[in-house]
């Protein structure tokens, strides 16, 4: 009976693959045999290897999450995971219908996500889960700017450090940072943008973070550069900060705010921004057509990488922005730049792995991080997600 059920699930999987509409897929089955499926429309060429019948069963029974967990466990592999993810995203609606996770699994994932709400306590816990892996971990594969957000490649020849500084420049231009401006950076990371804004724009910067690891690193970095008199880093939640600032910058911190707190976040920006000020944000967004399913069924990233995370779609931001008395003035998307950034990070992560493996990280962690970077790259290449630089100003007079 068990053998019959396994064969039935394999037949079902192959039937699903036979409806490929885009690109091509080469499938290697547990017995070593290979099947090739070609779509009628252009798309990426990808491959996938199933190392056990259990992997087939997990994909059929648990859908996207089953696939991701099977990859983490070494039961499914691909020579180009980002291409496989891109191909899957291009068939997302069909695959979701054919391989939906079972009801209990979906409920458990929703409960986990719900328990990771970004209250002040929850935010600190969620941020620590990801960023307190250790500064040594991140410094081993990030570039010299220690920047963990999408770069901007002005030229094909730009290396990662140059492209990260391009991003800093674009955000500083968008915010119109001038010499003497007091700039607030919400989610200052390891201090890369703060250092740039002081050295290159003559600004005074207050950076805030709720990661103790990042706080300590950024303070030392700015002190070592002789910038402590013009740049300060505070370990504080954005909801507890007081004061008024000429300009505000926030780089890919919004994804950690959580939908329940979007209004609170924009209200904080509105109250912290001086009259006539400008707030420049860099944020990852998701297509609005995919948003409801994304909210309903938390994904691999929310479960294993960024607990409590939530990508916005642009239409869903309109109400909280308006209610906070703000107005969106510019929106510039550059998703393919993020795809390239992620590919470079993955190469650098793999190059650094021998040293990381000697520390506290095992092969399951390695496969999880490779999947995370490939998962995001594929999403950007397929256009399901984007990264945007956004400019906000007050839409009404504010007191002060």
Each model region followed by its residue ranges:
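Feature captures hydrophobic
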Residues: 1-164, 170
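A short glycine-rich, Lys/Arg-flanked "PGG" loop and its adjoining helix->strand segment in the class I
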Residues: 263-276
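Conserved beta-strand signature within the Rossmann-like core of class I S-adenosyl-L-methionine
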Residues: 276-284
């Amino acid at each position: 009976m068990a053998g019959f059920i396994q064969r039935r699930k394999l037949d079902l999987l192959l039937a699903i693959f036979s409806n490929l509409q885009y690109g091509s897929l080469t499938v290697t089955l547990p017995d070593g045999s290979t099947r090739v499926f070609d779509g009628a429309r252009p798309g990426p060429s990808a491959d996938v290897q199933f190392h056990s019948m259990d992997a087939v069963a997990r994909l059929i029974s648990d859908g996207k999450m089953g696939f991701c967990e099977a990859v983490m466990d070494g039961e499914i592999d691909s020579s180009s995971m980002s291409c496989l993810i891109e191909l899957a995203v291009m068939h997302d609606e069909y695959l979701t219908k054919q391989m939906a996770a079972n009801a209990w699994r979906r409920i458990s994932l929703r409960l986990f996500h719900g328990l990771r709400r970004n209250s002040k306590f929850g935010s600190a816990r969620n941020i620590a889960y990801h960023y307190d892996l250790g500064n040594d971990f991140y410094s081993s594969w990030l570039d010299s700017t220690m920047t963990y957000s999408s770069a901007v490649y002005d030229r094909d020849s730009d290396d990662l450090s140059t492209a990260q500084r391009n991003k800093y420049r674009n955000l500083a231009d968008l915010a119109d940072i001038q010499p003497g401006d007091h700039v607030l950076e919400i989610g200052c990371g390891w201090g890369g943008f703060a250092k740039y804004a002081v050295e290159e724009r003559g600004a005074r910067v207050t950076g805030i973070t709720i990661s103790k690891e990042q706080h300590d690193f950024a303070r030392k970095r700015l002190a070592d550069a002789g910038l402590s008199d013009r740049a300060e880093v505070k370990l504080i939640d954005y909801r507890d900060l007081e004061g008024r600032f000429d300009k505000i910058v926030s780089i890919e911190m919004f994804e950690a705010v959580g939908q329940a707190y979007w209004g609170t976040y924009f209200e904080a920006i509105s109250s912290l921004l001086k009259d006539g000020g400008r707030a420049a944000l860099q944020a990852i967004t998701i297509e609005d057509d995919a948003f409801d399913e994304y909210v309903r069924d938390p994904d691999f990233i929310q479960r294993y990488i960024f607990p409590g995370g939530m990508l916005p779609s642009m239409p869903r931001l309109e109400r909280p922005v308006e209610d906070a008395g703000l107005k969106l003035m510019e929106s510039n998307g550059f998703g393919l730049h993020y795809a390239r950034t992620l590919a470079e990070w993955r190469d650098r992560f793999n190059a650094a792995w021998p040293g990381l493996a000697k520390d506290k990280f095992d092969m399951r962690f390695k496969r999880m991080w490779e999947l995370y970077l490939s998962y995001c790259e594929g999403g950007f290449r397929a256009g399901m997600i984007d990264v945007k630089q956004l400019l906000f100003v007050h839409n009404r007079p504010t007191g002060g």
